[in-house]
């Protein structure tokens, strides 16, 4: 891991319960979505795919700069110049962000409608067997399920919203 983040480096604390923070969180992983999208675009080009999907969200989120619509738009513009598929062949690979403008509540409702296997998902920043229930990600997830009126099927150490 690169380090520099509460998710990848033990020198940093994972914040608990401050979902309304207005500064960059210590759980930000440097260039994470830049790296993911770079790999995904390369793989899409090899496969001949025309779309790459990423689950970024900028409504109820922890303030990561690479989850913002502006980042996705700029990366799309860069990708249009950076791959043979787009720059030479004229075959566009479009980045799709279906969760970008949805609240956590709306994401839970959509997932429920689509039959998403929520029991196999894990959002906790602390990475334990059970979700902690107190980190930002757990709080946002729990709040989304509560607002949607849907029972969150995963195990938590504590379930305080």
Provide a role label for each language-model segment.
Residues 1-114:
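ATP-dependent adenylation/nucleotidyltransferase module used to activate substrates
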Residues 136, 144-153:
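Short cysteine/histidine-rich zinc-coordinating motifs and their immediately flanking basic loops
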